[in-house]
A protein has these predicted regions:
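Bacterial Sec-dependent N-terminal signal peptides
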Residues: 1-33
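Zn2+-dependent metallopeptidase catalytic domains
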Residues: 22-202
Length: 202
């Protein structure tokens, strides 16, 4: 998941979101009565699971990004520190389901950034993009995590994977390789520096 380049705000449910935004009756939690960012901390309780745009303010994004990164780091640590041998469920599925908070806030923020960029949104984008780039590097250059993926990818005998499951495993394996996991430590550090520089230019 390359969050800092995300621009795909729920295209499949765009019509549903539009209807909801237009017809919402104002019920639900108001912006001032909850912790900033908490709107993104769980699944949306809205028709079609659409983001409740009328309840989201610019003050929600920074804490939600911070919380999302923190929670995904915990989820990744749980995978890499699992004493059990890697399985499709405890490694690939767990990885695929990680970062739900970050997914929600990224989808909304980067989608709205392109549609209605305010000075505040622009400042948040400038600040958060390098942070998300570093977070992505921390995942895709995580040797312990890749070792578990590689173990599964190198020998799928006995895994009894469906075609869809194998494609997901193969996708993650290739994403890690393309992101530089095979580089030596010095090369990885240089890659991090390049990615940081590039993220500061976007």
């Amino acid at each position: 998941k390359k969050y800092y380049s995300m621009r795909k705000i729920l295209l499949i449910t765009l019509a549903a979101m539009t209807i909801y935004a237009c017809n919402n009756n104002g019920s639900g939690v108001k912006k001032g009565s909850r912790e900033a960012g908490s709107i993104f901390y769980k699944e949306y309780d809205t028709p079609f699971g659409a983001p409740p745009f009328d309840e989201i303010s610019e003050e929600d994004y920074r804490p939600a990004f911070a919380k999302g990164i923190e929670e995904q780091n915990k989820e990744i640590d749980s995978i890499t520190n699992n004493p059990e041998a890697p399985t499709f469920e405890n490694t690939i599925v767990a990885l695929d389901f990680s970062g739900s908070i970050l997914d929600r806030v990224s989808n909304v923020f980067f989608g709205l950034e392109g549609a209605e960029k305010t000075d505040t949104i622009e400042k948040i984008s400038i600040d958060i993009t390098p942070v998300l780039s570093e977070h992505s590097d921390n995942i895709y250059l995580n040797s312990k995590l890749f070792d578990r993926i590689k173990t599964l990818h190198d020998d799928t005998t006995g895994l009894n994977l469906t075609t869809e499951q194998y494609r997901l495993l193969d996708k993650y394996y290739k994403n890690f390789v393309r992101s530089g996991i095979m580089l030596n430590d010095a090369e990885k550090q240089r890659l991090r520096e390049i990615n940081k520089e590039l993220s500061s230019l976007t």
